[in-house]
Every structure is written in C-alpha cells, then in structure tokens.
A protein has these predicted regions:
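Short, charged juxtamembrane terminal tails flanking transmembrane helices
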Residues: 134-141
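Alpha-helical transmembrane segments of helical membrane proteins, especially in multi-pass transport
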Residues: 58-74
Length: 141
C-alpha cells in the first residue's frame, strides 16, 4: 500500500540519519554531524566538542539506536503489516511517540530545546502516513 511504501521510505531515511550520526564518531566525518548538533543546540549553546572518547561513544550509540528504529519501522511496514496492519500501525505509533517524548524531554533538560523542535520533523514523518487509516482500521476491527 501507499502507507507501507511511505513507512519504508521513512525507515530508509532514519537508517541513513543513524548511519551518518554513528559515522560522525569517526573524526573525519564529524563535520557532517556537527551541522545537526549546532542546529539542535541553537540558540542557547554552541555545538559541543566531541573530541573525547565518551562523546564519540554516545554518538555511535545514538546512531546505532536510530538505525535500529529505522529497521523496526521497515520490518513493521514490510512483515508485520501483512499479518496485521493494525498491529503494525500501533507498533510504529507507540515506538515513535515513546522515542519523541523521552528524547525531546531530556533534550530540553540538557539545554538543547531546538532538538525537541527538530524531533517534530521525524515524528511527523513517521505518523503522517498513518493519518486517518488508524481510525478506519480500528472501526473495522
């Protein structure tokens, strides 16, 4: 379906973001991630220096978790959807909202409120393809 295709495209974009972020832990590729970090910390703080091993580990971990999120969305849209579109939508929706609430809340706590705003782009990207379909599916169930 068109909804599944949109979710698979979203999954690819999220995996690409995660791979870029993880690869940014390698010093020659940090500049690509620094652009995002500067936007996420704007206007309160400059982007942090990630020269230390702990910061680079956190980038690698964040990237890895983003890749896993993208793979989960792909699997839901591709495999789970065929068995139960409603279950796939719930899985994607609940995963997206749990990520958004935790990531955005603690981004604000960390002094990077713009990251919460940037997170809205990812949240919309994942949830908008399901608009309307969820209510129809639950009514039919």
């Amino acid at each position: 379906t068109k909804e599944q295709k949109n979710q698979r495209l979203n999954a690819i974009l999220i995996v690409a973001f995660g791979l870029t972020f993880a690869a940014g832990a390698w010093t020659p590729l940090y500049d690509f991630v620094a652009i995002y970090l500067q936007a996420a910390h704007w206007p309160l703080n400059p982007a942090p220096d990630i020269a230390g091993p702990t910061e680079r580990l956190l980038m690698a971990t964040t990237g890895g978790l983003s890749v896993a999120l993208g793979v989960a969305i792909w699997t839901s849209a591709h495999d789970v959807w065929n068995a139960s579109p409603l279950a796939a939508r719930r899985l994607i929706r609940n995963t997206a909202w749990s990520w958004f609430v935790v990531d955005s809340t603690f981004s604000i706590v960390a002094g990077a409120p713009m990251n919460a705003a940037l997170n809205l782009v990812f949240l919309a990207m994942v949830l908008l393809p399901m608009r309307g379909a969820h209510a129809e599916a639950e009514a039919a169930a």
